[in-house]
Regions:
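Conserved MFS/SLC helix-loop-helix module at the cytosolic interface between two early adjacent transmembrane helices
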Residues: 72-111
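Central cavity-lining transmembrane alpha-helices of secondary-active solute carriers
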Residues: 65-78, 259-271
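Helix-breaking motifs and short loop linkers at transmembrane-helix boundaries and internal kinks
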Residues: 54, 85, 106-111, 140, ...
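C-terminal transmembrane helical hairpin of 12-TM major facilitator-type secondary transporters
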Residues: 276-325
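A late C-terminal transmembrane helix in Major Facilitator Superfamily
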Residues: 334-365
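Extracytoplasmic gate region of multi-pass secondary transporters
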Residues: 42-43, 217-269
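Cytoplasmic helix-loop-helix junction between adjacent transmembrane helices
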Residues: 116-153
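Helix-loop-helix hairpin linking two adjacent transmembrane segments in secondary transporters
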Residues: 141, 150-196
């Protein structure tokens, strides 16, 4: 009887593996949205922290870099997730990030800020290493769509985050924003309850040495793409409120402008991966890599109301490449999804850290607007590297 039923059970497993499991995807992307809402507090609070603690732009940039530092652990976290499943990190991360980011105003000095942001960085790393692999497994044959929804949820969180932080700043003041953390605690509780109904998945692996040549060919161009793209998106994503407030904008206007940019990224994230499922990863990634720096140049050259539509296009194209690259990694490393994503996230966060500090140094020496010009120039170097990405395997294993 076992021999007779075995083929049908295998067929059921294949169908299940190829199916887009919306309920599981929604659970994970909800966690991503809530987590990234709180992790997006730094940029809108940065002008006030600079004023309160008399920070230089270089010190301000280092704060963003501190949150990225724990990303060095991402490959290890990804490796462990492939072995034993670490979804508890996905459950706890919203509560941890909500607590630390709502307490930034309590910091009496630069060192305390560093400690709080390092804890936030640990939460970010622990969340972002396993969660994309969870999305890929739940997305079946439509990994691009799953990654688009995942990234869109994060971008939506980074859209709401500046607005929530600006509201909290005006309502409670910088040193009394702690009540804003409460929804994050309830979110972790709700995610825990929802995850109880989802079975634990541990990846069935081949040896990592077998896929190492593929990983090398893939990550060689990706490292360059991530590095130069990091400067392009960090300028607007981290320093836009500081630039605008330095030029006379109000707290609310600066926060709203950042939210507009991030919301455009939500749309870009949804479209990027989904379109790449149909047209191919490389063509879509190449197109957005060409258009994104052009839009940043446009933002710097326009003034008044014209900056808004240009900023929307900058967010649309600049933030749409992440789900495409995540899908590329998942396509090439189907038997090592978490560790592949861990390496990708580690490289991404390290490059974002370098970019944040680099732009801060340029801002101190040349001014932020001139620093933004250099970020746009760096973005022009991305598109040639896209051409070096190896072709996606014709047959992708569905895990």
């Amino acid at each position: 009887m076992n021999e007779l039923t075995s083929p049908s059970s295998i067929d059921v497993e294949k169908v299940e593996a190829s199916r887009f499991q919306m309920d599981r995807v929604m659970t994970i992307i909800s966690a991503h949205f809530i987590h990234d809402t709180y992790s997006a507090f730094l940029a809108p609070l940065l002008p006030n922290l600079i004023e309160k603690l008399s920070l230089s732009y270089t010190q301000a940039g280092s704060l963003s870099a501190i949150t990225q530092l724990p990303s060095l652990l991402n490959p290890i976290i990804g490796y462990l997730d492939d072995k034993v499943n670490l979804r508890i990190f996905v459950i706890l991360a919203p509560a941890i990030s909500a607590t630390t980011m709502s307490c930034l105003g309590f910091a009496p000095n630069y060192l305390t800020l560093v400690i709080l942001l390092f804890i936030t960085g640990m939460s970010i790393a622990a969340f972002h290493a396993p969660s994309p692999a969870m999305i890929a497994r739940a997305s079946g044959s439509r990994v691009g769509r799953g990654m688009s929804l995942y990234m869109a949820a994060g971008e939506l969180g980074r859209t709401i985050g500046p607005l929530l932080a600006s509201w909290g700043l005006l309502t409670f003041t910088l040193g009394r924003m702690f009540p804003i953390a409460i929804p994050g605690w309830f979110a972790s509780l709700a995610i825990f309850i929802r995850f109880k109904g989802i079975p634990v998945h541990v990846e069935k692996q081949t040896g990592f040495r077998e896929v190492l040549p593929t990983a090398r060919r893939l990550f060689f161009p990706l490292i360059g793409i991530i590095f130069f793209r990091s400067f392009l998106i960090t300028g607007l994503g981290v320093y836009l409120p500081t630039l605008l407030e330095g030029e006379g904008a109000s707290i609310w206007k600066a926060g709203t402008t950042l939210a507009i940019y991030q919301f455009a990224g939500v749309v870009g994230a949804i479209l990027g991966g989904t379109i790449s499922d149909r047209l191919g990863r490389k063509p879509v990634l190449l197109a957005v890599s060409i258009l994104a720096p052009i839009m940043v140049f446009g933002f710097l050259l326009t003034s008044g109301w014209l900056t808004i539509p240009v900023l929307i296009l900058a967010g649309l194209f600049g933030l749409s490449s992440q789900p495409i690259m995540l899908a590329i990694v998942q396509d090439h490393l189907p038997t090592h999804r978490s560790i592949g994503n861990g390496f990708f996230m580690a490289i991404n966060f390290i490059c974002l850290s370098v970019a944040a500090i680099g732009i801060g140094i340029l801002g101190d020496r040349l001014g932020l607007r001139q620093a933004f010009l250099w970020t746009a120039l760096s973005g022009l170097l991305v598109s040639p590297l896209v051409l070096l990405i190896p072709r996606t395997p014709n047959r992708i294993s569905k895990m």
